[in-house]
Amino acid sequence: MEIGTEISRKIRGAIKGKLQELGAYVDEELPDYIMVMVANKKSQEQMTEDLSLFLGNNTVRFTVWLHGVLDKLRSVTTEPSGTKSSEPNIFESNHSSSKSSSCVSDERRREDTLPPLAVSSTRSERTDSRVSTSSQEQRNTASRQSCEDGSASRLMSTVKPLRELSPSEAVIDIKPEPDDLIDEDLNFVQENPLSRKKPIVTVTYGSSRPTAEIYRPPASRSADGSLQVHRLPQQGNLQGNRQLDTQSCRSLETVQLCNPEAFGSLAESYRPTSKLSADKVGSEEEGSRKRRLPIVSSVVKVKKFCNDGEEEEEEDDYGLRTGSISSSVSVPAKPERRPSLPPSKQVNKNLILKAISEAQESVTKTTNYSAVPQKQTVPVAPRTRISPEESHLEVIHLQSRLPALCSQLQVEEPKEQAVEGIQGAEQKELSSRLQVDPVIEDTLQVTQDYYDGESMVHTDTRSFILKKPKLSEEIAAQNQQLGKRATEAMRVLSGRLIQTRDQIAQPEKPASPKFIVTLDGVPSPPGYLSDQEEEDMYITEGLKPIPQNICAGKGLKGLRAQQMQIVTRQLDSSDVEMEQLNVLQKQEKVLERCKYWPACKNGDECVYHHPTQPCKVFPNCKFADKCLFIHPNCKYDAKCTKPDCPYTHASRRNPLPSPKPVPLPTQSVSSSSPLCKFFPACKKMECPFYHPKHCRFNTQCTRPDCTFYHPTIAVPPRHALKWTRTQTSE
């Protein structure tokens, strides 16, 4: 029963490892489900059909592997001599069955005479002996170094349980961990030798107990690569060993080496002591005796059942006498974490690399924005007022462009020394700067630089976009083709960003084409305006050209005293004009009181009028609830039934039913006979005159055009109209 449990546990671990290898999502239920199918002896086709939902394209591969393992297990189980060791050989090595049989037969012979030893991976008790494993091959360091360098092959090895008389002997269990059964088809030594490597756990103990020399028979097992450890029998208690668990003993196997020639000189030394000192763990200098091969193993100790005080004292005395290192522990590395998602659902590495490269390119790449030729953003400084005496000259350089439809003016301010040196030759310099350019769009850039820092507090830096200034007649005399098509025009729209959409021409001046632009009396605007406000200001703004009498003979000094043209804008009245525009915009709303006020959700965006001032003629206001001013709230609010209530109703009132129209009595007279003058009180049954027919609805009739008669008095009840025979006296 215990053998079957161990085999089932290992089969289940192998199935779980294979599922993780295939990339399928593994939980505790799927391996159990597969084990149930194995127990039910499902065929390969049935398993493929049932597991296709979970494994997808890997179903066939998994079922072929599983049935191959089961077939090996059945073939080994049928052999009578290999019953107890067949299953570990399937899961841990790929040796032939004959090799396994030889190892198992020896194990069976030992099991008949010796009790099993319990193996515990979590015990911290002491062991009492030193085990030394060696081989008969050459013992040189070169072979050991070649083993460490050529550690491409992976070892899956266990040491057979040592059958001896003493219960205090140590047992070396180099046993594969459950995670090691995950790799390719349980024989990954040949398929993927470099896939996963773990350092071996090496524990070195010091002891004063005599050691049993371990020998190898010269001719018994030299052909195969397995090392069988033999010990000389020592004294012990056989009855105590019988009580140990036998399940772990069956899982112990012989040491199976992939390359026995290369690893023949390996040795393991274990010196048990009474204590494990954590402070002396760093003594890694004894690496010559430690194997750093990729062997996944665990070294365990047998729990000591006999309390020998003398032995403990001897161990303590030996530790103090020799001063050797008590222990040296090397912990195995943490196994690599495998992804739980299948490869088809995992993130593609190419996409991640592509995203990283695109992000780096976007960071390093600079974006080039195309310049807008019509608009220019200019910072506006606070208001500065400069006296005309301290203002400097600004010289405008004209650059005309063929086909002579537009020209570009650049207003620059020369320094004081340059102004003094240039007299009559300035106009020739201006004409020499005229250039040919077929571009039609032109701008005027006015740059003002002020150098006198004592005469002002702030520097007013503004840029103006003017529309197509034209040349004067004097430049036309120097260059007739340009002078015929150019006119003088300047327009200063604002100290902000403004684009002109039409061409405003000013009267031509017969003087030099030098323009002086000043900002006297122009306050700085409070901020930037929207496009709509700029358009409104453009409509309402006006230019104020101030002509000056110019003496051409005075040169630039005369121009400084008498400015040829000053373009100013009256911003003082701009606030009033904006208020008027706001009033006009408000007047554009429908002059009708909002019927949802004061509960209107649109607020100021509502196109209807919302009252803001109280009505002065209330309660004599004749507009009632349609008044454009505020009336007091009605105390009945929505329950008010008065149709012409002058008060304000916050809630919407229910419309009252319209009164029923009273039908007018028809006065139509028959053409044949006149209307009876006693109608409707006529009681003569044979009256020849016309009696109108009564309406069947009587006074309840609601049709205004009803042609039947509607009495104005109440009709007598039905019982009053009942005829009775008159009583005759006898």
From Swiss-Prot:
Residues 277-288 have a biased composition (Basic and acidic residues). It comes from the Eukaryota. InterPro entries: Nab2/ZC3H14 (IPR040366), Znf_CCCH (IPR000571). Residues 93-104 have a biased composition (Low complexity). Residues 76-92, 130-145 have a biased composition (Polar residues). Residues 308-317 have a biased composition (Acidic residues). One of its GO terms (cellular component) is nuclear speck. A zinc finger (C3H1-type) spans 588-613, 614-633, 634-649, 676-693, 695-713. This is Zinc finger CCCH domain-containing protein 14. It comes from Gallus gallus. The gene is ZC3H14.
